[in-house]
Amino acid sequence: MTPVSEIGTLDVLIFLVFLWLLSKLVGRLVRRGRTTPLRGPANKSLFFGLTRYLNEADDPGAIYESWAAEYGPAFRVPSVLGSHRIMICDAKAIAHFYSRETFGYVQTSLARSAIKNLFGRGLIWSEGESHKRQRKALSPAFSNAAIRRLTSVFFDSSYKMKAAWDSILESNPNNSVIDVQKWMNHISLDSIGIAGFSHDFGSLDGKHSDVAAVFDSFGTSKPSYFSMVIFLLAQVFPILLKLPTNRNLLTNKLRKTMSEIADVLLDRTRKEKEGKMGIVEEKSIIGLLIKAESAETELRMSQEEILAQMNVLLLAGYETTSISLTWALIELSKKPEKQAKLREELLSQFTSTDPTWEQLTSGLPYLDSVVHEVLRLHPPLGETSRVAAEDDIMPLSTPLVTRSGQTVSSIAIGKGTVVGVPIRCMNRSEVLWGKDAKEFIPERWLEPGFGENNEIQGHRHLLTFVDGPRTCLGKGFAIAEFKAALSVLIRSYTFEFPGPNGAVPKIERHRSILPRPKVEGQDGAKVPLRVRRVE
C-alpha cells in the first residue's frame, strides 16, 4: 500500500479534477431528469456542440427559427463539452421567463464573470434585491422629464457631426464616401459623455480620447481562433476569461480605461458639489450616482457599484445607439424610396427648427416606424441566456411534441438548466410578424391594428430591450438619441452605396463587443456610404 506521504501533488490534482468532473456529470444527469425531454438538432461537435456553428453563422436567428419550425417552440441545443441549453421561441414561455428574471432565472456563470471583468459589480451584474435597489436609484435619470431635458444635447452632437461632414464634403467634393459607422460611434460617445456625465469627449472635434481609442480597437481587431476557443470553453470554465488572449487583454484594457475616466469624472463632480464650483443636476445620471453614494437609505450605492454603473453607461451609450444608427443608414441606402419618404416627412415640418421631445415621441410617425423597424430587424443583442435558480414549470402558447412522443402544453425546467431566448429570431419570426418579417418595411408599423395579435410583451412587441425586471433602463434615452440624430442626418444628406449604380454590397457581421455590421471586403467594421448634401 502506498504511504500517504508518497502521494504526489499531481495525483491529488488528478483526483480532485476527477471528483469535480464526476459531480458535474451527476448534476447534469439530475437536471436532465427534472427537465422535459425536448427534441432538438443533432450535435455537430463533441467539443463545441453547436455553439461554434451558431457563433460563426451570419444569421443565427434564422437557424433558431428553422429549428423551432422543426422541433417546436422550445428545443434542446447541444453546447460545449456535452452540456445543453433550452431555447424558447414561444410568446407565453418568454413572458413567463422574463417575469421571473433576477430571482427565478439568473445570469449564467459566464455572463457574471464577463460582466464583472468588464464593468464591475453594478446593475447588470446584480441579482434579486441588489438589482432592484440599484435600478430604483437610477430610474429618475431615465424618466421622460429627464430625457426631455437631454434632447438638446442629442441635437447639439448631431450638428457637430454635420459641421465636420460639411467640411469634408467642401474640401473633397469629388469623393464624398464616408465611413458612417466611425462617425456614429463618435456621435454616440460624445452624447453619452455630455448627457450622462457633463463631459465632452470631443471625438466629433477630432480630439484624442483614450476610451474612444480602445472602443475603436474592437472595431478594427478580429478575435483570434485561440480567443474564440477560450471564449466558448469559458461557458463551462468561466475562469478561462482570465487567460491573456488577445481579446481578453483588450477587454482588460477597456475596463481599465473606462474605470480611470469614470474615476476622474466622479471625483470632479464630487468637488463641484462640495465646493459649489458648479451646479450638479441631481437628476442627471452622475448627479444621481453622487446622491446614491451619500444616501443613508436603502438606495445607497457603494463606490464599486457607482463606478460599475458609469462603465456600463459609457459602453452602452457608445455601442448600442451607434450600431442602430449605422443599420438605419444601411437600410435606408438599400431602399432610397423609403429614405425619400422619411426626408419628406421631416422637411415638411422642420426646415429651420428641430423637433421637440414630444414631437420626436409622437409627432413623426414615419420616423418612429423607421426607428422601430431597425430595432426589430437588427437588435444589438442577438440572444439572452439565464440559468434556472429553482425548478420551474414554463407554460406554452403552442403545444409541442417531446422526444418520447408526448404532446405537452408546458415544460419542466430543472434547477441549473440554461435557458435562452433568441431575440433576433423572435423579432424576425414569420409566425409573429408575417411572411415579410425579414424585410425592412417601416410601413408595417402604420397599419391599423398592427401588433394587436402579437403576444410578445416587450416594448412595442419587440424583445430588443428584453422584458421584465431587466428591461433596458435606458431605452427611452436610446430611442430619443436615435431619432434626434437620424432626423438631422436625413434632413441634411442623401445616402447611397458607393458601388456602380448604388449596387448593394453584402453586409457581414463583425465580432466586436457587440456584433456590428460591416461591408464585405472592408478591413474592420467599416460601412462606407456616398454622402451628398440635400439641396
From Swiss-Prot:
Membrane topology: Multi-pass membrane protein
GO CC terms, sorted: membrane
Record EC number: 1.-.-.-
Pfam families per record: p450 (PF00067)
Function: Cytochrome P450 monooxygenase; part of the gene cluster that mediates the biosynthesis of clavilactone A, a meroterpenoid that features a unique benzo-fused ten-membered carbocyclic ring unit with an alpha,beta-epoxy-gamma-lactone moiety, forming an intriguing 10/5/3 tricyclic nested skeleton. Cytochrome P450 monooxygenases claO, claP, claQ, claU, and claW are close orthologs, suggesting that a redundant function or pseudogenes are present in the cla cluster. These monoxygenases are not involved in clavilactone A biosynthesis nor its modification.
Cofactor(s) the protein needs: heme
Functional pathway: Secondary metabolite biosynthesis; terpenoid biosynthesis
Ranges annotated as spanning the membrane: 7-27, 225-245
Compartments in which it is found: Membrane
Residue sites binding heme per the record: C472
Keywords (A to Z) from UniProt: Heme, Iron, Membrane, Metal-binding, Monooxygenase, Oxidoreductase, Transmembrane, Transmembrane helix
Protein name: Cytochrome P450 monooxygenase claP
Family recorded in the similarity comment: Belongs to the cytochrome P450 family.
S-S bonds: none
Single GO term (MF): heme binding
